[in-house]
Curated annotation (Swiss-Prot):
Binds 2 Mg(2+) ions per subunit. Residues 14-106 form the GS beta-grasp domain. Mg(2+) 2 binds at residues 139, 192, 199. This is Glutamine synthetase. It comes from Methanococcus maripaludis (strain DSM 14266 / JCM 13030 / NBRC 101832 / S2 / LL). Pfam families: Gln-synt_C, Gln-synt_N. The lineage of its organism: Archaea, Methanobacteriati, Methanobacteriota, Methanomada group, Methanococci. The gene is glnA. The keyword Zinc-finger does not apply. Keywords: ATP-binding, Cytoplasm, Ligase, Magnesium, Metal-binding, Nucleotide-binding.
């Protein structure tokens, strides 16, 4: 059987009556068109045609896509991603398939975030025989509604706590089972540092599959929380005074089918490729965060304290540096970029991280010496003496860095780059001109 026939067999076996053709906008927010599966020979013929060729949609209302005068677009399903949604009824079930966005002339749409990542990966493969693997650690909060109608942390537990303190153990159990039904290899789940904060870790994979998984992960958790009358949020810093939510990204590149970060004879057992990749990440870090930390709120997390990864340095085990190389060495040697948060569009975030790292490899950059001291405890003068800079303090400063970065501009492509800058500058202006509760409390007495 070909791929379409296999998909039709899966649909029949699982009694699928609706298929969600899913894609994401420039923010990484999932969108979909629900296609009803029809009975009879005519229905089967139509289904085959849709699975093979895709479905048309109007792209003019999708932020960051196209204008109304050129709005017709097509969703072409990646049939490897077809999966029944485990939270929907098993009778007359609902499946989703992740799609690539195409123009009506049959070419990949340059504003499709998934297509953007695939384009950069294809170039990497063509030039260096390269593969990019990512293992993210997205954190999130589970909230409950209090008597005043406010959303507050659903439990009072802390890091690695057990029930009864850990009031989120039941919802995490449901999340793990649902993710496994969706094909995830879940490695661990636990309560995080802050009240109501959680983490569920899943196995690394190639960058496109991992980005698909991040989108599915967030949808699954939000849906299951809502079914229990709770709210799941991936907002980077929902509450003042406690840790925010990050999405540390473990990553490695393979060249010609072999891992490229390990060298038993080298200092720290890290290859020249690894050192140059780290140097590239550090060199572009101030621009990268505009994409990996893309909201005004992201920079409420990226402040000194609360274990925030603001220091542009690398280390072997020191978590106060923005890049860390975890202890295991060998085939699984990887680096960890600690700045990203789960508000990012994973396709675009992985694109800019890879582009930055590969720029370091191509330029044969040398990484500075690792900083194994606690950078959080250093004064600004001490950090300056060590040559340790910080990421931008707000979204606008990060956007200004990105706007002048030709490497990341080329990776994102003209369409996404210009739309991202425009949309995010508008977001910053909206924030900048808003009058906040803090200002009212502080200045109303004047």
């Amino acid at each position: 059987m070909n791929a379409v026939e296999q998909a039709m067999e899966y649909i029949k076996t699982n009694n699928v009556k609706f298929i969600r053709f899913q894609f994401v906008d420039i923010h990484g927010e999932p969108k979909n068109i629900a296609y009803p599966v029809k009975a009879g020979a005519a229905g089967e013929e139509e289904l085959y045609d849709v699975l093979e060729k895709g479905v048309y949609f109007d792209g003019s209302s999708i932020e960051g896509f196209v204008s109304i005068e050129s709005s017709d677009m097509m969703l072409k399903p990646d049939l490897k991603t077809l999966s029944v949604l485990p939270w929907r009824p098993t009778e007359k079930s609902v499946a989703r398939v992740i799609c690539d966005v195409y123009t009506t002339n049959g070419k990949p749409f340059e504003g499709d975030p998934r297509g953007c990542l695939k384009r950069v990966l294809a170039k990497f493969d063509e030039e260096l025989g390269g593969e990019f693997f990512v293992g993210p650690e997205p954190e999130f909060f589970i909230l409950k509604e209090d008597a005043c109608g406010s959303w507050v942390p659903a439990d009072d537990a802390g890091y690695f706590d057990l029930e009864p303190l850990d009031g989120g153990c039941d919802i995490r159990r449901k999340i793990v089972f649902a993710l496994e039904n969706l094909g995830f290899h879940v490695e661990a789940s636990h309560h995080e540092v802050a009240e109501g904060q959680h983490e569920v870790d899943f196995k690394f994979a190639d960058a496109v599959k991992t980005a698909d998984s991040v989108v599915t992960f967030k949808t699954t958790i939000k849906t299951l929380a809502a079914q229990d009358g709770l709210k799941a949020t991936f907002m980077p810093k929902p509450f003042f005074g406690i840790n925010g939510s990050g999405m540390h990204c473990h990553q490695s590149i393979w060249l010609n089918g072999e891992p490229s970060f390990y060298d038993e004879s080298a200092q720290y057992q890290l290859s020249e490729t690894c050192m140059s990749y780290v140097a590239g990440i550090l060199d572009h870090a101030k621009s990268i965060v505009a994409v990996t930390n893309p909201t005004v709120n992201s920079y409420k997390r990226l402040v000194p304290g609360y274990e925030a990864p603001v220091n542009i340095a690398w280390a072997n085990s020191n978590r106060s540096a923005i890049v860390r190389v975890p202890a295991p060495r060998g085939k699984g040697t990887r680096i960890e970029f600690r700045a990203p948060d789960p508000a990012c569009n994973p396709y675009l975030a992985f694109t800019v991280m890879l582009a930055a790292g590969l720029d370091g490899v191509k330029r044969k950059l040398s990484a500075i010496e690792p900083v194994e001291k606690n950078i959080f405890a250093m004064s600004e003068a001490q950090k300056k003496a060590e040559g340790i800079e910080s990421v931008p303090a707000n979204l606008k400063a990060a956007l200004d860095e990105l706007e002048n970065n030709s490497v990341l501009k080329d990776a994102l492509g003209k369409h996404i780059f210009e739309n991202f800058i425009e949309i995010k500058n508008a977001e910053w202006d909206s924030f900048r001109t808003a009058v906040t509760d803090w200002e009212t409390k502080q200045y109303l007495k004047i």
